Amino acid sequence: MFGEFAFRARVGYGMVMDFDLSKVSAHQTYNLLIGLIAPRPIAWITSLNLEGKLNAAPFSAFNYMGIDPPIVAIGIGNRPGPGVVGKDTAQNIRATREFVINVVNERLAEAMVFSAIDFPPGTDELELAKVKTVHSSFVKVPRIAEAPASLECREFSTIEIGRSRVVLGQVIAIHVKDEFIDPKGPYIRAEELHAIGRMNGLGSYVKTRGAFYQIPRMTYEDWLRTEAERK
């Protein structure tokens, strides 16, 4: 079924399909990884080109990598077609070294998906989607007004890897709507934010509304006490 790059092996807990990724196409590898690394947070990135034209596009190869300094990482591929031409977002970040990550909730989901259309370079996706923006505090790139939260970023570095790249951005400011902030921490009221995540396949997403549950985390001292009580 999968040819020479995959085979089944029996282990103590059942049958396992093993894939040799050195023999798997990029598309097949993509299908496997996005199905396993899920759900993924969505970075709805706004950026400007050198002429000041706004671009917006979503990316789910995204997460935070550290807090001192605060670093986020985004994997950005190339535009469809032959050659290695980075997507508008990657080109804009490299040119201006600034971008904004906007958090996507259920209310913004359809507009976010619309902005993923492969429009010609220089197209303002947010204008077409009738999504308003507001000025950022430290970067020239505007942020999405309706986003529950936004992260102003400056490019820390970009790592070119094969036909794609990983952009490391340093977060220099965070904007969060009042209703999603608990001032005691400050903490994010994540249960009320209703963020969405990306799953496998085109158009496949997951809601976080009503999906939270708690698993008590045991300390080493708790574990020692529990073990002593069992004896």
Briefly describe each language-model feature range.
Residues 1-16:
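N-terminal amphipathic/basic-hydrophobic helices that include classical n-h-c signal peptides
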Residues 12-231:
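Basic, polyanion-binding surface patches
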